[in-house]
Amino acid sequence: MQKYISEARLLLALAIPVILAQIAQTAMGFVDTVMAGGYSATDMAAVAIGTSIWLPAILFGHGLLLALTPVIAQLNGSGRRERIAHQVRQGFWLAGFVSVLIMLVLWNAGYIIRSMENIDPALADKAVGYLRALLWGAPGYLFFQVARNQCEGLAKTKPGMVMGFIGLLVNIPVNYIFIYGHFGMPELGGVGCGVATAAVYWVMFLAMVSYIKRARSMRDIRNEKGTAKPDPAVMKRLIQLGLPIALALFFEVTLFAVVALLVSPLGIVDVAGHQIALNFSSLMFVLPMSLAAAVTIRVGYRLGQGSTLDAQTAARTGLMVGVCMATLTAIFTVSLREQIALLYNDNPEVVTLAAHLMLLAAVYQISDSIQVIGSGILRGYKDTRSIFYITFTAYWVLGLPSGYILALTDLVVEPMGPAGFWIGFIIGLTSAAIMMMLRMRFLQRLPSAIILQRASR
């Protein structure tokens, strides 16, 4: 029992800074929305539309680079720290290549925006302008993620938290300058949010690099002799590990976007109630997601040390802590669902629907916690391909179709509206949790030599 308590302390010490970093990131988006809304409703809508296109694109690159964390953790655990610098340099090359592709996609996203049904031309122009300003921050964001993954792979999660809050503090005044045109800068409105956010990502990257150069604990790995050229073998391996994670993230983000589109014709009350419940659920999701990042680090480190039993302990402890957290957040959601809904909107119909949907959200929080921590465990074992297959099957083969049938058709019951989609979420997330656990159990039953061989690739 003592080993699980000790492991839980280590996991929480890693996870809490990740939680705070994620809160800072979420707050940046909130600040952009509020400050753009203070300028005009059109500018706020433009930022919302631009963000809905930016997120799937940049999260794809983010997911690709998540492969670095277990690779570095495993090298650190095995005492092969001299190889970490080369992996990081190749991560920067990969981030550079991917950022160019993302920038090209975002530059041409105007075709998507202007093809939206009944969109106001002025709104479309502002959304395109916002994206074309923001896309210059894509390299800065991805380079920052490489540096952050280096730190987190070495079990140092506090730097990412500090840089997140530095970014938030810089974002507010820079937003103000570019939205309203102060200190000789042009008055850009919502487009100014894109300029500010792009600048902030570069500030965060440069601040993180400055920290790494000065950190004594990383002095032995930050210098590499000669100029590091692209290494096709290393980059191929990073892509093999990262692409399934990137696709899984992409499928998850697009799932919720598709559901939002399917709910939109049902009316203002249904859309508002759905959005409130989804927004609150996303806030609660930060807890297991951050714990999953910590579990990836611990499992990778233990496998690097050659101890499959300690890796199992880290995995099981992560799941137990995650289930406890989810139980508490579910109780909190059920107990205060109406008060929470009132924080967003005071329309009685909207509050009633949102409170009802939050009951369903409380049901799936435990499944959601298990599936996301399970994904973190599999990343630690470098078994990322199975994450893609499980995510795609659970969300797009089981969850979305069942939600659509329940919400919009009478094949099973009378059309349930948004609640049908939320039952679909429960089906999808529970299926993902079951499949993640089965895969984890399969991996942990393999002979230790095979597990360690797979982890060292």
Swiss-Prot record:
**One cellular-component annotation, GO:** plasma membrane
- Give the record's keywords alphabetically: Antibiotic resistance, Antiport, Cell inner membrane, Cell membrane, Ion transport, Membrane, Peptide transport, Protein transport, Sodium, Sodium transport, Transmembrane, Transmembrane helix, Transport
Q: How does it sit in the membrane?
A: Multi-pass membrane protein
One matching Pfam family: MatE
Tell me the residue ranges located in the Periplasmic compartment per UniProt.
Answer: 32-52, 114-126, 181-188, 264-275, 335-349, 408-417
Name the Gene Ontology biological process terms: cellular response to reactive oxygen species; dipeptide transmembrane transport; protein transport; response to antibiotic; sodium ion transport; xenobiotic detoxification by transmembrane export across the plasma membrane; xenobiotic transmembrane transport
- Give me the segments passing through the membrane: 11-31, 53-73, 93-113, 127-147, 160-180, 189-209, 243-263, 276-296, 314-334, 350-370, 387-407, 418-438
**What's the main place this protein lives?**
membrane
Against NCBIfam families, the record matches this protein to: matE
What the record says about family reads: Belongs to the multi antimicrobial extrusion (MATE) (TC 2.A.66.1) family. MdtK subfamily.
The record's HAMAP family line, in alphabetical order, gives: MdtK
What the protein does comes down to:
Multidrug efflux pump that probably functions as a Na(+)/drug antiporter. Confers resistance to many drugs such as fluoroquinolones (norfloxacin, ciprofloxacin, enoxacin) and tetraphenylphosphonium ion (TPP). Also to deoxycholate, doxorubicin, trimethoprim, chloramphenicol, fosfomycin, ethidium bromide and benzalkonium. Also able to export peptides; when overexpressed, allows cells deleted for multiple peptidases (pepA, pepB, pepD and pepN) to grow in the presence of dipeptides Ala-Gln or Gly-Tyr which otherwise inhibit growth.
Q: What is this protein called?
A: Multidrug resistance protein MdtK
Q: Which organism is it from?
A: Escherichia coli (strain K12)
